[in-house]
From Swiss-Prot:
Protein name: Small ribosomal subunit protein uS13
A GO cellular-component term linked to this record: cytosol
Biological process, per Gene Ontology: translation
Gene3D superfamilies: 1.10.8.50, 30s ribosomal protein s13, domain 2 (4.10.910.10)
Family: Belongs to the universal ribosomal protein uS13 family.
Entry superkingdom: Bacteria
PROSITE patterns (alphabetical): RIBOSOMAL_S13_1, RIBOSOMAL_S13_2
Organism placement in taxonomy: Bacteria, Pseudomonadati, Pseudomonadota, Alphaproteobacteria, Hyphomicrobiales
InterPro entries for this protein: Rbsml_uS13_C (IPR027437), Ribosomal_uS13 (IPR001892), Ribosomal_uS13-like_H2TH (IPR010979), Ribosomal_uS13_bac-type (IPR019980), Ribosomal_uS13_CS (IPR018269)
Gene coding for it: rpsM
Length: 122
């Protein structure tokens, strides 16, 4: 099993699909990485040589922000918004939808399970 960017990549899958297991690499970046390294998209991970795996690893380290670094940057951006006291930061702090969705009904995923209200019956 190949290990790239601290993630065990499944060996039986195609390289383009397997690279998506890394946080921060989606379909577009996976295809882009394969083109840069010169690996055909149909090639399976278990067919890669050690040199090709090393080349993929170096390309990702050099050109892309993935896994822990990406998660850290995202959380720092959210923390910055909260410290600024912006509207978006306030919504994050209150665990409400940030991008303008309605909250009168719905938004249960963001708000958590419904709280029981005493005396509220239909």
């Amino acid at each position: 099993m190949a290990r790239i960017a601290g993630v065990n990549i499944p060996t039986a899958k195609r390289v383009v699909i397997a690279l998506r297991y890394i946080h921060g690499i989606g379909p577009k970046f996976a295809q882009e990485i394969c083109e840069k390294v010169g690996i055909p998209a149909e090639r399976r991970v278990n067919q890669l040589t050690d040199a090709e795996v090393l080349q993929i690893r170096e390309t990702i380290d050099r050109d892309y922000q993935v896994e822990g670094d990406l998660r850290r940057e995202t959380s720092m951006n959210i923390k910055r918004l909260m410290d600024l006291g912006s509207y978006r930061g306030l919504r994050h702090r209150r665990s409400l939808p940030v991008r303008g969705q309605r909250t009168h009904t719905n938004a249960r995923t963001r708000k958590g399970p419904a709280k029981a209200i005493a005396g509220k019956k239909k």
